[in-house]
From Swiss-Prot:
<dbReference type="InterPro" id="IPR020596">
    <property type="entry name" value="rRNA_Ade_Mease_Trfase_CS"/>
</dbReference>
<comment type="similarity">
    <text>Belongs to the class I-like SAM-binding methyltransferase superfamily. rRNA adenine N(6)-methyltransferase family. RsmA subfamily.</text>
</comment>
<comment type="function">
    <text>Specifically dimethylates two adjacent adenosines (A1518 and A1519) in the loop of a conserved hairpin near the 3'-end of 16S rRNA in the 30S particle. May play a critical role in biogenesis of 30S subunits.</text>
</comment>
<keyword id="KW-0963">Cytoplasm</keyword>
<dbReference type="InterPro" id="IPR023165">
    <property type="entry name" value="rRNA_Ade_diMease-like_C"/>
</dbReference>
<dbReference type="InterPro" id="IPR029063">
    <property type="entry name" value="SAM-dependent_MTases_sf"/>
</dbReference>
<feature type="binding site">
    <location>
        <position position="23"/>
    </location>
    <ligand>
        <name>S-adenosyl-L-methionine</name>
    </ligand>
</feature>
<keyword id="KW-0808">Transferase</keyword>
<dbReference type="InterPro" id="IPR001737">
    <property type="entry name" value="KsgA/Erm"/>
</dbReference>
<dbReference type="GO" id="GO:0005829">
    <property type="term" value="C:cytosol"/>
</dbReference>
<dbReference type="InterPro" id="IPR020598">
    <property type="entry name" value="rRNA_Ade_methylase_Trfase_N"/>
</dbReference>
<protein>
    <recommendedName>
        <fullName>Ribosomal RNA small subunit methyltransferase A</fullName>
        <ecNumber>2.1.1.182</ecNumber>
    </recommendedName>
</protein>
<dbReference type="GO" id="GO:0003723">
    <property type="term" value="F:RNA binding"/>
</dbReference>
<keyword id="KW-0949">S-adenosyl-L-methionine</keyword>
<dbReference type="GO" id="GO:0052908">
    <property type="term" value="F:16S rRNA (adenine(1518)-N(6)/adenine(1519)-N(6))-dimethyltransferase activity"/>
</dbReference>
<feature type="binding site">
    <location>
        <position position="70"/>
    </location>
    <ligand>
        <name>S-adenosyl-L-methionine</name>
    </ligand>
</feature>
<feature type="binding site">
    <location>
        <position position="95"/>
    </location>
    <ligand>
        <name>S-adenosyl-L-methionine</name>
    </ligand>
</feature>
Length: 291
């Protein structure tokens, strides 16, 4: 990340392998900080501070403490020169996919702000909010993430929308997602080939006790169904629905039709179906079979 003045201060060529694009639009930077709703008790994890434009705004905010993680050693040197005199700031050199997510001074981090490199969006989301089969390492209250617009649209999509996908189901079962703003490619230096979007994610404070028990089955179910997202359910999972009375009852109770497509089924109904399947089916050779 970086603002106009900061961009000029750092003599650093963006590295493609790190997915580096400096955010230079001050209006977008302000919207990110506003969306984080920072107060004097908040401790923020900033992912990929880059050249420090957003870092500066976070330090100026009411937040109690900022812990940043940066992978590029050259940028780490510049960031330390610029911010190490700040008592409320600490910088850790490392890969966000493996580095500790706690603050170096021992405070508990409750919010995350990140400009996500496009090539690690999926793995980073799993680490920050968890996945169907595994709870997250840390519990965060709010995440404000800048990501590729196409991915953001999938996180935000509702059932029936053309962007609704297996990713939509996975994330919406774990958190509430809210659109913050669009970020055209011209807001970055260098400009990426695609536009971006800022999304606010609020992980649910409590998860259904059965959630992680059926997570593995639900993951396989989504993979199976959305592999043919244009196909009706009767052509993807219909064989075990029509042969299983309990599953047929579930479909009837929830008002689900086999003539619907996978993107028309709500996250809660996918979860409910997985719970019903756990009691009545097993997976053999990649297909669902009645017990």
């Amino acid at each position: 990340m970086g603002g106009d003045n900061t961009l000029n201060d750092f003599r650093h060529i963006p590295r493609k392998r790190f997915g580096q694009h400096w955010l230079k639009d001050q209006g977008v930077l302000d919207q990110i900080v506003k969306a984080a709703e920072l107060n004097p008790e908040d401790c923020v994890l900033e992912v990929g501070p880059g050249k420090g434009a957003l870092t500066e705004k976070l330090i100026e905010s009411q937040a109690k403490f900022i812990q940043a993680i940066e992978l590029d050693r050259d940028l780490v040197i510049g960031l330390k020169k610029r911010f190490n005199h700040q008592n409320k700031f600490s910088l850790r050199e490392g890969d966000i996919l493996s580095a500790p997510l706690d603050a170096e001074n021992g405070v508990t981090i409750n919010k995350v702000v990140a400009n996500i490199p496009y090539n690690i969006t999926g793995p980073l989301l799993k680490r920050l909010i968890g996945e169907l089969r595994k709870a997250p390492e840390n519990s965060f209250e709010t995440l404000v993430l800048l990501m590729q617009k196409e991915v953001a649209q999938r996180l935000l999509a509702r059932p029936g929308n053309s962007n609704f996908s297996a990713l939509s189901v996975r994330v919406q079962l774990l958190a509430k997602c809210q659109d913050v703003c669009d970020v055209p490619s011209k807001c970055f230096q260098p400009a990426p080939k695609v536009d971006s979007k800022v999304v606010m994610i609020k992980p649910f404070a409590s998860i259904d006790p059965d959630f992680y028990e059926v997570g593995n089955l639900l993951e396989k179910l989504l993979k199976h169904a959305f592999a043919g997202r244009r196909k009706k359910l009767r052509n993807t999972i219909g064989s075990f629905v029509t042969s299983n009375d309990q599953i047929k009852e579930f479909f009837a109770y929830r008002g689900i039709s086999l003539d619907q497509r996978p993107q028309e089924i709500s996250p809660s109904n996918w979860f409910g179906l997985a719970k019903a399947l756990k009691e009545t089916c097993v997976i053999e050779n990649g297909t669902f079979q009645s017990k």
